Every structure is written in structure tokens, then in C-alpha cells.
């Protein structure tokens, strides 16, 4: 068995117990025995395993140097080389037998027996400023004799502690790792919900080949469940115990995560459940939230980058928008769509096998053959003179199980007028109609070609609709084009959304708001929330800042 196979075996079937890695018994290593680090590193005699061009293996003497910012290895061979890894890229370390089997218990170790210390990282090479990071997994192996097993296990424990993102704040405060005191933490555990039919149908393969190995390298225990029917993910999270999983991961598209959010909000203990950290591996057609998280961390929206974010991430606040139609309330993390984009989103469902290409095909059909304009009204709350919105639990009791209120609509003196008529000749203008204690309600009235409301930056992998949006800023971003502009203008907008340059195109407007009301004139118009059809006759929406939590990469500080 190769070292890669030993550490990154495929996950167990969903019916099997949670998969766990065999690990050395290091419980007997006390914090005192781990210091000073410099003395430990000076005693170690390691040889780096180097593959040559002819697939032969060389073993060159190597020495570790660890700082609060980097793991440095100096190899003294014919060509002296230095390996420098940022802790922000290091996943973890494992001790292996010479055959690549994980060492289970360091007992009866023969002094002359050969073992390997494996260090695993997800590195970004040749990254240029203002570009997204492309990553790949790299493995580094160091041979040692059994007589040094205890010292290597100490080094392994230090590497895993410093590489664990939960310890970033501790490590960053140190001038030297000689000052490090190990704080015992439970192993991270993720619940992984795989939707095998999401998008082009490769979600399970993506997880097994690209994600599972990285989580194992990072010492994350996983429990994998394969979703086999509609709303399965919702059913799972309705029943999961809280406080058990460090993250609930959806492997699929935005629809998979939509089920998880609805399930958490349906629980009687929703106020605690919605704080369960969630994560996403892009395996669907749109993958808007995955790309929004990656974009904010300057990462590409690929599965490897998403797995890196899970392995090295920490929970960060995520805005949730309550959307109601007078009959029911749904909870959105991504977007609300009306007019041509809603027809494209829903009309392309039958083209799922095309992946992201489905939206392009459907849009061309919409532009050429379908109705061009959609009459209706949009009311939005303009708070340009008001400061940043508060986080939800700053103004609401975290222990209360009362559902999130839409106080910007329902409070005394709040909300847009219940029944308003546009002034003559002013149908396409925004008008100050009503001021309340939160700001000014303004109306957009007329015909629209597209209305796209974003909670985050990306609606899909190739749709950067709200370049300035962050997933915890407390705002929705309404991007629209009115009916006074041509199909050519709409086409120019859509051709530019991949880079966000559509904001400079003719007729494109965007407003930022915490609350809005959408009223289509035609009852047959489609409206979508996070890609799911929602009935009218109207939709009211209000953002709850930081209500949920999503895994995102922290900003690692460099100390040279």
C-alpha cells in the first residue's frame, strides 16, 4: 500500500460507522516534554525522501526549523535545498511505517526499524497579486529510525497543533515556538452530506478523490451520508445532535445547502441549530455560495480550494434573509430572482447534465424567443445615512426560540405603504415615498428586464453579480435593468457578469438594502429564492446579519 493510499483511503459507505484514522497513542506526551522545541529539533536525525527524475529514491539529511509563521526544512544533499511552508498551507503530519501504513501504537518499536514522518500541505505556487489562488496537495516524507520514535511523535504533535486553525490565535501571539504550550483539543469531526445527483452527477467522485484525502491529512474525522431522495439533507439536520459536529458539509450545489438551512430553521431549537457551522464543496451547477466564500478568501472556486477552506477554516458569520409571501417564510443565504433571470434559472433545470453551461443555453433561448419585459414594483429601504446594521444576536436574545422577526416591515410606523400608486410620468424612477425610523422607503415602478438580488457576491461560478458584497455585511444587493433598455443592453450585461464588469454597462443599476418588497404585476411570473420557486403574489425580505455560520479561511499573519 502506498503512503497516499494509507492516509487517504476512500470514505466508508454511508451505512457504515463513521470512519476514523488509526493514530499513534500520544496521550502520554505532556506539554512540558514538548519544550524546548529547539533542543528537540537539534536531536532529530531525519532523512528527506526525494524522488529523482528516473523514479529512484534518494535519502538526504534534513533538519526542521519551526517558527510561528513557517515550517522550514533544510535538506543537505548534492544540491542543498530549503523547503518553506506557511502554516496557513500545512494540513497536518502523520507517522507511517516504511510501507506507508499508519503507525497505531509506538510499542515494541525496533530501534533499527525504518519509519516515515509525512507532512502534508495544500500549497499555492506562483500566486500573482489580484488573482485567485490555485492550489494542489503536496506530500513530504522524512525517514527516521525507530529509536527516535518518541521525539518524532513530539514533533508530529507540535506540527498538528500549529497547523490546526483553531490554534491560530495562540500561535500568532508567540515570538518563538519554544514558548508553545500544547492545549489538548478534541479531534475535529465533520458530518458530510453528499448529493450524488447534484449538477452533472460527479459530487460523490469529487468528494472521494479530492476532498476526503485532504480532510484525513488535516486530522479531521468524517461521517459520510449519501443523500438518496429529495429533502434528505433537511431530514438529516432536523435530527442531528448539536455540539457533536464541528461542521455540516454539503457536497453538491446550492440546493443541497438550501435544504440544510431550511432544516436548521425548522427545528424547535433553531436559535442554537442555526449556529451550527456549515460548509460547502461545489458539486452542483451553480455553486454560488462556494464561489462567494472562495472569492472573499482570494481562492479559486475549485473543489480542492473548497476542501482547503474546510480543512483550514473557522466558523464565520453568514447573513440569512427571511423571505415571506403572506403564506410561508423561507430562509435565503444566496439570492432572489425575478424577471428573465428567474425564467432562465428554472427553465434550465432540465439541462442539469450540462453543469454551469445550462444557464448559458437557457439564457440564449430566453433572450431570443421569450418575453422581454416584466412589469412590477420594488420597494426597498434606503439607509444610506444610517450606520452599519447590527448583528442579529446583538439585538435579539440568543436564548429565545421566537422566530426571526421582520421588524423593518412589522414594527410600528415601519414598512412601505400598503397600497401605493406611481405618479404620472414617474414610473421608472426611484421615489422617496415614506420615511420611517430606519430610513427611507423608495419605490422602483415600471417594466424590468432583470432583477437579481444577492446576499453574497456570486450567484454561480461565472456570475459575480455583487462584487462589493460580503457574506456577513448585513445587506442585500438589488441589481436590475429596467425595460427602457434593449435586449442588446441585457446581452452586454450578461456577457460581463463573470468578472463583475457588468456594473459599468449601460442600464445596469444596483442598490444596497436591508429590506425590500417585490410585487410582480403578473401572477404568472416566476420568482426564485436560492434557485427554488417561491409563490407570490409578492415577496417581502429582510436580512438578519450574521444569523448563521459558514466555514471560511482566517487571515494568517506572517511573522518572519
Located regions from the model:
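ATP/NTP phosphate-donor binding region
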Residues: 2-251, 258, 262-265
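Short conserved micro-motifs at the rims of enzyme active sites and ligand-binding pockets
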Residues: 345, 390, 462-466, 489-492, ...
Amino acid at each position: 500500500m502506498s503512503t497516499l493510499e494509507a492516509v487517504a483511503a476512500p470514505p466508508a459507505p454511508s451505512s457504515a460507522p463513521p470512519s476514523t484514522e488509526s493514530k499513534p497513542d500520544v496521550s502520554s506526551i505532556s506539554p512540558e516534554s514538548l519544550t524546548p522545541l529547539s533542543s528537540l529539533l537539534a536531536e532529530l536525525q531525519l532523512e528527506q525522501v526525494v524522488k529523482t527524475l528516473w523514479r529512484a529514491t534518494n535519502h538526504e539529511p534534513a533538519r526542521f526549523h519551526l517558527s510561528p509563521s513557517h515550517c522550514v526544512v533544510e535538506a543537505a544533499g548534492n544540491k542543498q535545498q530549503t523547503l518553506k511552508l506557511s502554516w496557513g498551507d500545512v494540513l497536518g503530519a502523520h507517522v507511517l511505517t516504511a510501507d506507508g501504513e499508519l503507525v497505531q501504537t509506538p510499542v515494541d518499536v525496533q530501534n533499527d526499524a525504518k519509519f516515515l514522518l509525512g507532512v502534508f500541505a495544500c500549497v499555492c505556487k506562483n500566486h500573482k497579486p489580484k488573482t485567485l489562488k490555485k492550489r494542489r496537495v503536496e506530500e513530504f516524507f522524512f525517514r527516521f529510525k525507530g529509536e527516535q520514535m518518541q521525539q518524532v511523535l513530539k514533533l508530529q504533535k507540535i506540527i498538528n497543533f500549529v497547523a490546526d486553525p483553531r490554534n491560530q490565535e495562540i500561535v500568532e501571539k508567540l515570538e518563538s515556538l519554544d514558548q508553545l504550550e500544547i492545549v489538548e483539543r478534541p479531534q475535529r469531526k465533520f458530518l458530510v452530506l453528499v448529493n450524488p445527483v447534484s449538477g452533472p452527477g460527479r459530487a460523490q467522485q469529487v468528494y472521494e478523490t479530492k476532498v476526503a484525502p485532504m480532510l484525513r491529512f488535516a486530522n479531521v474525522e468524517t461521517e459520510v451520508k449519501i443523500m438518496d431522495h429529495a429533502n434528505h439533507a433537511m431530514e438529516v439536520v432536523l435530527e442531528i445532535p448539536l455540539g457533536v459536529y464541528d461542521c455540516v458539509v454539503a457536497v453538491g450545489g446550492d440546493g443541497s445547502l438550501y435544504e440544510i438551512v431550511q432544516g436548521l430553521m425548522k427545528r424547535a431549537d433553531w436559535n442554537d441549530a442555526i449556529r451550527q457551522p456549515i460548509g460547502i464543496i461545489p458539486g452542483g451547477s451553480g455553486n454560488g455560495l462556494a464561489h462567494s466564500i472562495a472569492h472573499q478568501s482570494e481562492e479559486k472556486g475549485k473543489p480542492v480550494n473548497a476542501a482547503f477552506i474546510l480543512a483550514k477554516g473557522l466558523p464565520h458569520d453568514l447573513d440569512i434573509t427571511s423571505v415571506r409571501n403572506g403564506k410561508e417564510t423561507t430562509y435565503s443565504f444566496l439570492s432572489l430572482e425575478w424577471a428573465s433571470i428567474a425564467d432562465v434559472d428554472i427553465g434550465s433545470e432540465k439541462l442539469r447534465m450540462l453543469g454551469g453551461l445550462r444557464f448559458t443555453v437557457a439564457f440564449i433561448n430566453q433572450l431570443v424567443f421569450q418575453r422581454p419585459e416584466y412589469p412590477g414594483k420594488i420597494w426597498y429601504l434606503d439607509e444610506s445615512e444610517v450606520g452599519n446594521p447590527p448583528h442579529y444576536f446583538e439585538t435579539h436574545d440568543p436564548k429565545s426560540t421566537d422566530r426571526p422577526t421582520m421588524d423593518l416591515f412589522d414594527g410600528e410606523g415601519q414598512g412601505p405603504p400598503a397600497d401605493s400608486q406611481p405618479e404620472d410620468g414617474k414610473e421608472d424612477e426611484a421615489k422617496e415615498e415614506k420615511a420611517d425610523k430606519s430610513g427611507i422607503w423608495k419605490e422602483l415602478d415600471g417594466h424590468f428586464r432583470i432583477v437579481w438580488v444577492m446576499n453574497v457576491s456570486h450567484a454561480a461560478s461565472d456570475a459575480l453579480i455583487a462584487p462589493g458584497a460580503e457574506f456577513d455585511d448585513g445587506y442585500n444587493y438589488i441589481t436590475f435593468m429596467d425595460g427602457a433598455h434593449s435586449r442588446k443592453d441585457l446581452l452586454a450585461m450578461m456577457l460581463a457578469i463573470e468578472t463583475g464588469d457588468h456594473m459599468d454597462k449601460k442600464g445596469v443599476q444596483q442598490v444596497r438594502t436591508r429590506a425590500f418588497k417585490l410585487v410582480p404585476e403578473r401572477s404568472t411570473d416566476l420568482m426564485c429564492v436560492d434557485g427554488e420557486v417561491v409563490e407570490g403574489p409578492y415577496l417581502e425580505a429582510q436580512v438578519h446579519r450574521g444569523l448563521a455560520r459558514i466555514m471560511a479561511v482566517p487571515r494568517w499573519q506572517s511573522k518572519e
